[in-house]
């Protein structure tokens, strides 16, 4: 596919101008011999025509020179077993075999070491030579000529097929994606083949490669003329999603192809995953296709007959090969420093990427080894946006080498604000005043003014017709609805939620509980820019830019108050005002470190001083229970500004990332993913062990965020300071950030400002919300005497304590439910409810399926595959799946076409999920009796049949 370069656009503009000049001069008669411009324009048109002619001739010569020859194929004689094995007194176990094309039969002596494989053993599914494996219960389908993906290509060595690859798009160029062991095989590659046509391979340039069998890939720069001759198109590489249906392709040559279907299964390591699509000899490197593109590349088997292995090329290409400075946001890949590798408890895999360098890989993180990232040398230091400098009271974007220590940083204006922070405050155009106080019976709020940074107020979303129709089948949906929106709903719900706040004093055993909990968390290190006694503006600014461009920033989210006046999304804000945002953060961090008496400031004074921004309040658009809708108690989101989020990332990012990476060994679980069964199983195994120490119990805290106490937040920040080894200035900045955090100014959509009159309350949109809530929840369990606890936010499972509800009430938290977890008759742990999931041994499913289905039926963009990823393990899935497939909406069902090729999807290859409430899984479509499928004919000794196969061949 041709993509015009910048030069092409420049030439187009130049020629358009030249044509206009020539037309005006020679056609309309305004030519003046004394003017040189028409002559120059005419010369430009002539030169461009000559250049185009030369380019066409050059391409034609290259096109003609590329030789196309018939693909070499290998003729084989296939013998089919025509009877059961029998014992011969001379030769042992033998089988009678007949050639498929007819002819005399032969007797085959079975190797004694293989006799035990004759029954339906998984080992019989392994390919005779190589790393491929069929999957027990899987099927192969014949691919019609031309029905395979347009990007698929076979790699040949003479008449043998070494494997398969694909033409994929990568950062402005198309490359051949193929396994390293295929491209650099013992048999040299000689040609690329497609639909019986082949083109000889040459010594083409390699963009990147890795010989390690665990990261087995090569990206080859194949000339465009070769792709054109073979009619191969490019496709995109996508991130794999657990449970996604995938399709493999392969065969002995590029004309007679077969395909297999399976599902992708995520692993802890980002660079690999497993799948259940079958493969065969010569299928190495077959891309794993989904409806929208390629999600991986097959490299071998894991367990013979059970699962195959693939590498996540999205991770490889976007993190290890890409020359871009930012990472993709899809799956939270994180680049860490080599120093941080030593802080992880798990091992890292070190590999070398050709043309890139050495890199260490660990789960979802990676770190480049110094001097190993060769392509980084091509980046100029000047590529980094330069920090600002104050010159004569003005902000100048030029080289600046300023530093600051414990004194006020930079050149501060009156009131202790940097120039950028002053400009940020002016954007909000705050009109502070002393208004009336709203007495809620809990946390009081006072009207303190208004802001011109307002947000659109829209009406309540109507109930979709699809939801109304579905209530006849799923009456649970009638108990849900969309909440009201706008400032009226926000202030009403705020006062209701704030009424739950019950201020309490720190308990007497807080110090002991603090020390006990502290010992269960890993220790990190602060960013290098904070370790020195004197902070460098440039060092902090550079680190802020790195954080601001990371994949962890939600590009679609609002920047909050007041920067929403500059852009509606973080993506647009960073694209247009990156330097300004980075300068604000770089000014705010040392400003926080400079205040020793911040407790004397009111929330509005903190905003006026530039220490923090107002927190925007809005109603989350998710289905709410009807009882909450009647009460007007909606779920509120406290959107912390992007500047304050980046301040928190600078101060607490290292510790948060370490806790995410180490989630399996610590009480806090923000890093877990219950949609991946092996992670859910790891949680359950851990809980079963803890259950033997003290019986497990589930606690449901009502309105947790709105009942968080200031002493709980202080305990969390002090733990962060110790765990992160914060130097004095950084520790002061951290404490002051938390002081701003627990004494906030809230803003409604209409610009109304409200000030907290008491410290406390968790802000749901903070970068630290998940980690802080998890630690506070574990601290609460420690305070009431529970011997163990795991927590994800406000959800927890803990050791049972008598009178727990009353003890939690004494801490200021309303525990509306506290019950022991389900056990077996022998007392072993049977199931737990955690994070809206029921977790059992080797099983986890979402309990809030009505909300998920309600949202699905209300959103036309989602497909059945999206819904299946969330609810496939739910006991309700079969009923939901049957209903959704009956809806006359092709966008929702997508059931009639193959995932990428347009022919019918094999209903037996991917069975529906099992429900423990049904005696058997949903039956597949009835098979038809017919002649044996070509898949069984091609692989007769495997006992493999297609969906409509009579089973006449392949019997052992």
UniProtKB/Swiss-Prot annotation:
Query: Transmembrane segments in this chain: where?
Result: 7-27, 37-57, 77-94
Cleavage (site feature) positions? 132-133, 325-326, 402-403
Per the UniProt entry, what are the Gene Ontology biological process annotations, in alphabetical order?
DNA-templated transcription; proteolysis; viral RNA genome replication; viral translational frameshifting
Enumerate the UniProt keywords alphabetically: Covalent protein-RNA linkage, Host membrane, Hydrolase, Membrane, Nucleotide-binding, Nucleotidyltransferase, Protease, RNA-directed RNA polymerase, Serine protease, Transferase, Transmembrane, Transmembrane helix, Viral RNA replication
Q: Which residues form the Peptidase S39 domain?
A: 135-330
> Which residues catalyse the reaction?
181, 216, 284
InterPro entries linked: DNA/RNA_pol_sf (IPR043502), Peptidase_S1_PA (IPR009003), Peptidase_S1_PA_chymotrypsin (IPR043504), Peptidase_S39B_luteovirus (IPR000382), RNA-dir_pol_luteovirus (IPR001795), RNA-dir_pol_PSvirus (IPR007094)
Q: What is its EC number?
A: 3.4.21.-, 2.7.7.48
Protein name, as recorded: Replicase polyprotein P2AB
Q: Which organism is it from?
A: Southern cowpea mosaic virus (SCPMV)
């Amino acid at each position: 596919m041709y993509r015009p370069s910048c030069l092409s656009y420049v030439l187009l503009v130049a020629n358009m101008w030249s044509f206009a000049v020539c037309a005006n001069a020679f056609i309309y008669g305004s030519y003046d011999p004394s003017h040189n411009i028409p002559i120059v324009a005419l010369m430009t048109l002539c030169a461009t025509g000559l250049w185009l002619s030369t380019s066409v001739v050059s391409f034609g010569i290259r096109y003609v020179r590329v030789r196309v020859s018939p693909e070499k194929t290998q003729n084989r004689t296939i013998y089919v077993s025509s009877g059961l094995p029998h014992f011969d007194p001379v030769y042992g176990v033998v089988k009678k075999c007949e050639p498929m094309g007819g002819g005399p039969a032969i007797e085959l002596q079975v190797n004694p070491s293989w006799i035990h494989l004759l029954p339906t053993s998984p080992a019989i599914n392994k390919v005779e030579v190589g790393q491929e494996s069929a999957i027990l219960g899987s099927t192969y389908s014949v691919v019609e000529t031309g029905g395979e993906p347009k990007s698929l290509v076979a790699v040949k060595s003479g008449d043998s097929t070494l494997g398969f690859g694909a033409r994929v798009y990568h950062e402005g160029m198309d490359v051949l994606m193929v396994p390293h062991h295929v491209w650099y095989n013992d048999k040299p590659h000689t040609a690329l083949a497609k639909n019986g046509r082949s083109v000889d391979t040459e010594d083409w340039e390699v963009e990147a490669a890795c010989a390690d069998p665990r990261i087995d890939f090569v990206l080859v720069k194949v000339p465009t003329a070769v792709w054109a001759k073979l009619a191969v198109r490019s496709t995109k590489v996508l991130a794999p999603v657990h449970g996604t249906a995938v399709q493999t392709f392969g065969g002995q040559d590029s004309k007679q192809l077969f395909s297999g279907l399976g599902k992708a299964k995520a692993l802890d390591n980002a660079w690999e995953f497993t799948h259940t699509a079958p493969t065969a000899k010569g299928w190495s490197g077959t891309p794993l296709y989904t409806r929208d593109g390629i999600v991986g590349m097959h490299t071998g088997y894991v367990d013979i007959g059970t699962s195959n292995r693939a590498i996540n090329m999205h991770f490889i290409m976007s993190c290890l090969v890409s020359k871009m400075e930012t990472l993709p946001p899809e799956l939270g890949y994180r680049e860490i420093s080599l120093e941080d590798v030593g802080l992880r408890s798990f091992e890292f895999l070190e590999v070398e990427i050709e043309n890139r360098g050495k890199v260490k890989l660990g789960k979802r993180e990676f770190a480049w080894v110094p001097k190993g990232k060769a392509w980084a040398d091509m980046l100029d230091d000047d590529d980094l946006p330069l920090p600002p400098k104050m010159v004569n009271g003005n902000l100048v974007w030029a080289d600046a080498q300023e530093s600051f220590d414990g004194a006020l940083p930079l050149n501060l204006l009156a009131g202790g604000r940097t120039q950028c922070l002053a400009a940020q405050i002016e954007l909000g155009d705050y009109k502070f005043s002393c208004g009336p106080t709203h007495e809620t019976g809990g946390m009081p709020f006072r009207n303190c003014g208004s802001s011109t940074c307002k947000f659109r107020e829209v009406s309540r979303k109507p109930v979709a017709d699809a939801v109304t129709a579905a209530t006849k089948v799923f009456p649970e949906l009638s108990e849900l609805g969309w909440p009201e929106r706008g400032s009226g709903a926000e202030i009403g719900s705020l006062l209701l939620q704030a009424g739950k706040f019950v201020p309490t004093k720190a308990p007497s055993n807080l110090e002991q509980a603090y020390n006990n909990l502290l010992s269960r968390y890993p220790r990190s290190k602060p960013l290098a820019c904070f370790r020195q006694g004197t902070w460098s503006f440039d060092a902090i600014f550079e680190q802020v830019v790195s954080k601001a461009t990371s994949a962890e920033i939600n590009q679609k989210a609002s920047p909050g108050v007041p920067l929403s006046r500059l852009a509606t999304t973080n993506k647009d804000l960073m694209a247009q005002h990156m330097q300004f945002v980075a300068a604000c953060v770089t000014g705010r961090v040392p400003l926080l470190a400079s205040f020793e008496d911040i407790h004397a400031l009111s929330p509005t004074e903190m905003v006026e001083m530039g220490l923090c921004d107002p927190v925007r309040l809005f109603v989350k658009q998710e289905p709410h229970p009807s009882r909450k809708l009647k009460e007007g108690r909606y779920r509120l989101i406290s959107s912390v500004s992007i500047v304050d989020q980046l301040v928190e990332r600078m101060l607490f990012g290292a510790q948060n990332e370490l806790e995410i990476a180490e989630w399996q060994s610590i009480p806090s679980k923000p890093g877990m993913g219950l949609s991946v069964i092996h992670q859910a199983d790891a949680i359950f195994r851990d809980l079963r062990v803890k259950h033997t120490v003290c019986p497990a119990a589930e606690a449901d805290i009502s309105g947790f965020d709105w009942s968080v106490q200031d002493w709980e937040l202080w305990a969390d920040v002090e733990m962060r300071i110790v765990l992160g080894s914060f130097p004095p200035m950084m520790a002061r900045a951290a404490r002051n950030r938390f002081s701003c955090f627990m004494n906030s100014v809230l803003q409604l959509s209409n610009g109304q400002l409200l000030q907290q009159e008491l410290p406390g309350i968790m802000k749901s949109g903070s970068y630290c919300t998940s980690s802080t809530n998890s630690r506070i929840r574990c601290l609460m369990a420690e305070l009431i005497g529970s011997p163990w606890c795991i927590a994800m936010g406000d959800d927890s499972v803990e050791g049972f304590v008598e009178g727990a509800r009353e003890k939690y009430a004494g801490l200021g938290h309303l525990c509306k439910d506290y019950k022991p977890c389900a056990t077996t008759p022998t007392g072993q742990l049977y199931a737990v409810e955690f994070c809206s999931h029921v977790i059992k041994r080797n099983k986890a499913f979402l309990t809030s399926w009505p909300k998920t289905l309600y949202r699905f039926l209300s959103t036309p963009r989602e497909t059945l595959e999206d819904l299946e990823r969330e609810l496939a393990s739910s006991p309700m899935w079969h009923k939901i799946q049957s209903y959704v497939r009956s809806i006359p909406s092709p966008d929702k069902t997508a059931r009639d076409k193959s995932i990428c090729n347009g022919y019918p999807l094999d209903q037996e290859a991917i069975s529906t999920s099992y429900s423990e409430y049904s005696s058997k899984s949903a039956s597949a479509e009835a098979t038809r009796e017919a002649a044996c499928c070509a898949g069984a004919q091609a692989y007769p000794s495997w006992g493999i049949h297609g969906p409509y196969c009579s089973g006449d061949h392949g019997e052992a």
